[in-house]
Amino acid sequence: MNVTLLIPARYGSSRFPGKPLAPINGKPMIQHVYERASLAKGLTDIYVATDDDRIKDAVEGFGGKVVMTSAEAASGTDRIEDAITQLGLAEDDLVVNLQGDQPLIDPISIEQIISLFERHPGEFGMATLGFQITEEEELNDPKHVKLVFDNEFNALYFSRARIPFGRDTDDYPVYKHLGVYAYTRKFVQTFAKLPLGRLEDLEKLEQLRALEHGHKIKVAISAFDSPEVDTPEDIRICEARLAVD
């Protein structure tokens, strides 16, 4: 099975312009993401998918590969679809979508999501990661998307609210969604043609589109958190964690 990992990265960000190139311990953030991903076993290739020449130059500068995507891409999925079309991937090839703002991603988590497709061939077209929340402040923070899943680890729902809600107790595990996806090329093409979902639009969570249209999303629970960098303040947190990693 060919497995291509794509790291979508865009320069424009209302909260943090130029985020992929923000220096973390002397290297641009996108380099940390690329290098940590490259440690995962089972990958055929890794590319950064971007429409910005500054990001392209930075990635090629440290020896990484780039696929240039259209500046008209309306969503992350559109950028992924553009990239896989250019790369000429086969329908049953696996694509891992790792966000460019996760410099702390653990390669074992990437291996976990790949192994789901190896152990359950043909049972689903899309998979993602979850992590049990350990920080109290994350429970009710809408920035941290929560998820619930059934006994077979199929996602039931994703929400910015705390789910599930314990009516009589707060003593139960709550899981947050880690922004890593894997899917077959065929599923990406199917997903991109689906109309915007009502719940997707309410929560502003693209993955809900798959659930709303009856598609399974398999979940692997990671033992490693992968916090995203959303603001310049998050850089300092990453630097501290990388120093002891």
Swiss-Prot record:
Phosphoprotein found in the keyword field: no
Cell location: Cytoplasm
A Pfam short name: CTP_transf_3
Cellular component, GO, one term: cytosol
Cytoplasm keyword on record: yes
Protein's pathway: Bacterial outer membrane biogenesis; lipopolysaccharide biosynthesis
Sequence intervals crossing the membrane: none
UniProt EC number: 2.7.7.90
Family annotation (HAMAP family): KdsB (MF_00057)
Family recorded in the similarity comment: Belongs to the KdsB family.
Identification of the protein by name: 8-amino-3,8-dideoxy-manno-octulosonate cytidylyltransferase
